Amino acid sequence: MPSTRLVWTGRVVSFLGALPFVPSAAMKLLRHPEVVKGMTHLQLPESMILPLGILELLCLVAYAVPRTAVLGAILLTGYLGGAMLTHLRIGEPVYMHVGLGVFLWLGLFLREPRLRELLPLRKRDHAG
């Protein structure tokens, strides 16, 4: 049984990692002028705004629901990968995207015992 402190730390880290996706998805769904401007800057068609907003929101919901959190983390990782490629393509840095991905996975690792079993950070004692 994982410690309560570990799980709560994971929840806080997960929340902090997921938080930037909320206004990002909302602004896309509302077609905020800054999003339109950003898409133009990234040389992407405006027609992609709504589908990206829906995709981002669905990935975020999957991450927030405990039963689908691992799937959500995988989907958000893919979403961030696409965002990184888009930014790298025009010579922009991707530090924020990498940091968000680390936060998402670290939070999930701390709050999800099945993930810690799958990816142990230390060697298991195989005695006995």
Where are these regions (language model features)?
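Solvent-exposed, well-ordered loop and adjacent helix/strand elements within mature globular domains
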Residues: 19, 23-48
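Extended, low-polarity transmembrane helix blocks
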Residues: 1-24, 64-128
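Generic N-terminal helix/loop capping motif
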Residues: 29, 42, 58-64, 77, ...
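Short hydrophobic/aromatic segments of transmembrane alpha-helices and their interfaces
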Residues: 18, 32, 42-43, 52-54, ...
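Short hydrophobic/aromatic-rich motifs at helix boundaries and adjacent loops
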Residues: 6-10, 30-33, 53-55
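Core segments of alpha-helical transmembrane spans in multipass integral membrane proteins
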Residues: 23, 44-64, 71
